[in-house]
């Protein structure tokens, strides 16, 4: 009887060890090894404030940084368009010309008193075959553009900037309708609104269909922060933050297309 008991105890211990090893193996499978050949780089140039992007530097400084940094898409935050006497002046177009990129302006809101459209400019490397801007609310737009991520892998690059509480719910509604396996959404949101944005996303999107990441920056007290929203077909791998001029920084986001 004693030998049978010891035998059963031995079997139980071996079984526990086997299950433990299997669990560890499964955990490893949940986090695949980083394949840098399937990784796209998205650049975000920002003060992470309401400040116009070019208030403390020249177009050429930003264009030079763009030309010398590996990327597939560049987002110029707060390149506000100003109504001139004869035309609308978009400060992002000069950088596009200097860096030989195709610009798309994405509005956030309209300031009637200052006669300007607050928004950002997204720079693409070549002619755009597909591009749509969806209304979030009032003047705020959600950009969706098909472009190459890396090595023949396409993505639907999306962008939106959220500067008020009333934009959160309609923006998340757009995410729910538009986010699919190809989506790589890079946006900015007021830091004070970030908890609400995360909460509404959690309540409205199915947990196993998306990944939401706040991109950490050196200044944890910045008025705005960057976020990345993708399907589980993509993985945010990290960010490299460099100074361009004064408090204008370039954030090089590394996002991998998973097999």
Give the residues covered by each predicted segment.
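Alpha-helical structural signal in soluble globular domains
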Residues: 94-102, 174, 199-208
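Structural recognition of the beta-strand scaffold that forms the well-ordered cores
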Residues: 44-45, 72-77, 104-105, 121-122, ...
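N-terminal, active-site-proximal structural segment of metallo-dependent hydrolase catalytic domains
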Residues: 7-10, 18-97, 110-113, 173, ...
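Positively charged n-region of N-terminal signal peptides that target proteins for export
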Residues: 1-6, 187
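Metal-dependent phosphoester-hydrolase catalytic domains
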Residues: 23-31, 146, 182-183, 191-259
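His/acidic metal-ligating clusters that form di-metal
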Residues: 144-160, 165-204
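Structured beta-strand-rich core segments of catalytic domains in phosphoester-bond hydrolases
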Residues: 34, 80-155, 160-163, 225-249
